[in-house]
Structures are given as C-alpha cells and as structure tokens.
Amino acid sequence: MTQNGETCLPDYRRGAKMAVLAGDPTKKGLFTVRLQAPAGYKVPPHTHPTAENITVISGTFNVGTGDKFDEAAGKSLEAGGFVVMPAEMKHYAWSTGDAIIQIHGKGPFQIKYVNPADDPRNAKK
C-alpha cells in the first residue's frame, strides 16, 4: 500500500486521492479512509465481501445499485449523507463535482468488479 497522491489501493480507479485515517484496509480489522473524488470520477458496478459504510464529508457523491451503471437510477448524497452497502451488493458510484467521502468497514477491503474489463488491475500496462 502506498500513498503517492493517487490511490493506496490498486483496485480503485485512478484519479481519486486516498488517505488512511485508521487501521489498514489491506489487513484484517477495522479501517477508515477518506477518498477525494474529482469531478467526473466514476466507479463501475462492483461488490465487496464485507459491508461498506460511506459518509459524504463535502460535495455531492452519487451511488446506485445493480449490475449496470445507470445515473438515472442512482441517489445523490450531500455533505453529511450516509449509506451502507451490504456485503456482496452490486453497486456503483460517481461524482459530478469534487467530493470527499469517508469509507469505514472491516478489512481486508476488496473490490470485485461486475465486468472484469472495468478492473484497473486488468489494464494493459
């Protein structure tokens, strides 16, 4: 795990910046991270093996459920908004403007993309 101004988890899409506040999301146990998502940032449909708890710190962050990315079916969360994505629930997210979110949960934090082609770990180098 590195924090180089981009992301500290290789399974997140590039463009966002992440800071670990507590714990280690790559290891067993509780963790809390903050993610700064720039305008236009999108996370395609995916799941996690454990619940994901998201709090919007600033800006507007959008989430939706299902195996297809559909902004019309999503929900906008303003600063102070909170949502829990249960383990294995297919969901996606995006920001139209700059947003900062806090994610907390139980590690190890893993992402499984519905479409393997969306997984940045599968990108050609």
Model-identified regions with their sequence ranges:
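Glycine- and acidic-residue-biased ligand/ion/polar-headgroup-sensing regions
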Residues: 38-41, 47-68
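Extracytoplasmic
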Residues: 13-16, 28-30, 49-51, 88, ...
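Structural recognition of the beta-strand scaffold that forms the well-ordered cores
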Residues: 20, 45, 54-55, 83-85, ...
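A short, N-terminal "cap"/entry segment at the start of jelly-roll beta-barrel domains
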Residues: 1-31, 118-125
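Solvent-exposed coil/turn segments that connect beta secondary-structure elements
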Residues: 26, 38-40, 88, 98, ...
